[in-house]
Amino acid sequence: MSKAAIQFFRGVNEPVVPDIRLTRSRDGRTGQATFRFEQPAAIAPETMGDITGMWMVDEEGEMVTREVNGKFVNGTASALEAVYSWKSEQDFERFMRFAQRYADANGLGYSQSQDSDQTEGADNQQA
């Protein structure tokens, strides 16, 4: 069983664990995960090569996004932000299986944002 990993260069696991935020449409079919890596190894000065995507690799295979952007502070690369989008419930379920494996491999937990319950709170106020 292979360990779940994120790669910016194929075959090279990124050691920095990102902050990941999920958003989904109301019907749950589409959505996206935004990954933010602070000071990732992929942008270290000794790293040579262009970042052309972010690969999420686990025992089921790999998923890839080409939507990767650098964040700069005073002209120096400081972070990477990648967005992975899904267009079906099956794609979302596949992403969540990867996310669970990645969390387990890196000792991470899951927390739900308070903002996700805004409509429920509004309904309660009207009652």
From Swiss-Prot:
Residues 109-127 have a biased composition (Polar residues). Gene3D superfamilies: Photosystem II Psb28. It is found in: Cellular thylakoid membrane. Keywords: Membrane, Photosynthesis, Photosystem II, Thylakoid. GO terms for cellular component: photosystem II oxygen evolving complex; plasma membrane-derived thylakoid membrane. Residues 108-127 are annotated as: Disordered. GO terms for biological process: photosynthesis. InterPro entries: Psb28_c1_sf (IPR038676), PSII_Psb28_class-1 (IPR005610). It is a peripheral membrane protein. Belongs to the Psb28 family. NCBIfam families: PS_II_psb28. Part of the photosystem II complex. HAMAP family: PSII_Psb28. This is Photosystem II reaction center Psb28 protein.
